[in-house]
Amino acid sequence: MDDLRYGVYPVKGASGYPGAERNLLEYSYFEKGPLTFRDVVIEFSQEEWQCLDTAQQDLYRKVMLENFRNLVFLGIDVSKPDLITCLEQGKDPWNMKRHSMVATPPVTYSHFAQDLWPQPGIKDSFQKVILREYGNYGHKDLQLRKGCKSVNECNVQKEGYNELKEYLTTTQSKIFQCDKYVKVFHKFLNSNTHKTRHTGKKPFKCKKCGKSFCMLLHLGQHKIIHIRENSYQCEECGKAFKWFSTLTRHKRIHTGDKSYKHEECGKGFNHSTTLTRHKVIHAGEKHYKCEKCGKDFKQSSHLTKHKTIHAGEKPYKCEGCGKAFCQFSYLTKHKIIHTGEKPYKCEECGKAFNWYSHLTRHKIIHTGEKPYKCE
């Protein structure tokens, strides 16, 4: 029964009871290691169970089923307890023949009962338990006064227990109340989660990328991204990819596969986007127009370069002579003057030129062509 306080109820912070902002899954995961259903089950004594009305018993069923589903979702290896089977079938979880909960062996008192068992100052004891277990939740009317902690510290009074049941019935709906929007929360998990959202605190941080989350559950979902990250590796070059489809496209580089073919010229491409760009050439489409001079361009990058002419910008400067150019290609051509490089060679006579246009004009000598005629 001692596991109940750690598995179900919110826990105190280091400086007292500041909202008790960690829920059962978060606390158990970080503080206690692997979680079991025993850690998250709520157990009642026979008297406590009979004290609950139909709505409260329904609430109990929902909370227990949700706790079990959370364990399964987190991938924790847990066998299905008899209590869960019983709750799923809508049966009463209290075994009247054995006088115990279905999931647990017979006990004299549950941990919950021991904590709430009264001494003559019944209200004081109950308020102290509420403050200890629920961190006050912003309710200033719950004053902390001196009272007993458990059944071992005071004499058990039967008439006091009946008084406790009445007080519990009138007070329980206020325990899980959000002090910001005055919403009443009946689920043990949701009260902490809702309050954390108001504070904006994100205590759960991803060690891989540093991103923070307000819920452990959200952190778990986020980690799937990193698990998948670069999990698909190319056997040829060792390059890794996040998605299998990206790896498939990459492999075409090694295989030489060019499955995207242009119907007009028959040219093949690795990717559909490359084929789309190629089609523009055949169509003669010019989508990008200069607002200054009206000149059209097939690609936006070409228009961007062209605009530098109108702007008068010359960002590309020659280190040799300080001359500036509006386009990088112009600077590249200019540098040949300083280097003395002549990459364009005539196959007929071996003469070299630093400009391709100069080579083209030179070739006319060998062909005997005379394109320029006097009118």
UniProtKB/Swiss-Prot annotation:
<keyword id="KW-0804">Transcription</keyword>
<feature type="zinc finger region" description="C2H2-type 2">
    <location>
        <begin position="204"/>
        <end position="226"/>
    </location>
</feature>
<dbReference type="InterPro" id="IPR050752">
    <property type="entry name" value="C2H2-ZF_domain"/>
</dbReference>
<dbReference type="GO" id="GO:0000209">
    <property type="term" value="P:protein polyubiquitination"/>
</dbReference>
<keyword id="KW-0238">DNA-binding</keyword>
<dbReference type="GO" id="GO:0008270">
    <property type="term" value="F:zinc ion binding"/>
</dbReference>
<dbReference type="InterPro" id="IPR001909">
    <property type="entry name" value="KRAB"/>
</dbReference>
<dbReference type="GO" id="GO:0005634">
    <property type="term" value="C:nucleus"/>
</dbReference>
<keyword id="KW-0677">Repeat</keyword>
<feature type="zinc finger region" description="C2H2-type 1; degenerate">
    <location>
        <begin position="176"/>
        <end position="198"/>
    </location>
</feature>
<dbReference type="InterPro" id="IPR036051">
    <property type="entry name" value="KRAB_dom_sf"/>
</dbReference>
<feature type="zinc finger region" description="C2H2-type 5">
    <location>
        <begin position="288"/>
        <end position="310"/>
    </location>
</feature>
<comment type="function">
    <text>May be involved in transcriptional regulation.</text>
</comment>
<dbReference type="GO" id="GO:0006355">
    <property type="term" value="P:regulation of DNA-templated transcription"/>
</dbReference>
<protein>
    <recommendedName>
        <fullName>Zinc finger protein 738</fullName>
    </recommendedName>
</protein>
<dbReference type="InterPro" id="IPR013087">
    <property type="entry name" value="Znf_C2H2_type"/>
</dbReference>
<feature type="domain" description="KRAB">
    <location>
        <begin position="35"/>
        <end position="106"/>
    </location>
</feature>
<keyword id="KW-0479">Metal-binding</keyword>
<dbReference type="InterPro" id="IPR036236">
    <property type="entry name" value="Znf_C2H2_sf"/>
</dbReference>
<dbReference type="GO" id="GO:0003677">
    <property type="term" value="F:DNA binding"/>
</dbReference>
<dbReference type="GO" id="GO:0004842">
    <property type="term" value="F:ubiquitin-protein transferase activity"/>
</dbReference>
<keyword id="KW-0863">Zinc-finger</keyword>
<keyword id="KW-0539">Nucleus</keyword>
<feature type="zinc finger region" description="C2H2-type 7">
    <location>
        <begin position="344"/>
        <end position="366"/>
    </location>
</feature>
<keyword id="KW-0805">Transcription regulation</keyword>
<dbReference type="Pfam" id="PF00096">
    <property type="entry name" value="zf-C2H2"/>
</dbReference>
<feature type="zinc finger region" description="C2H2-type 6">
    <location>
        <begin position="316"/>
        <end position="338"/>
    </location>
</feature>
<feature type="zinc finger region" description="C2H2-type 3">
    <location>
        <begin position="232"/>
        <end position="254"/>
    </location>
</feature>
<dbReference type="Pfam" id="PF01352">
    <property type="entry name" value="KRAB"/>
</dbReference>
<keyword id="KW-0862">Zinc</keyword>
<feature type="zinc finger region" description="C2H2-type 4; atypical">
    <location>
        <begin position="260"/>
        <end position="282"/>
    </location>
</feature>
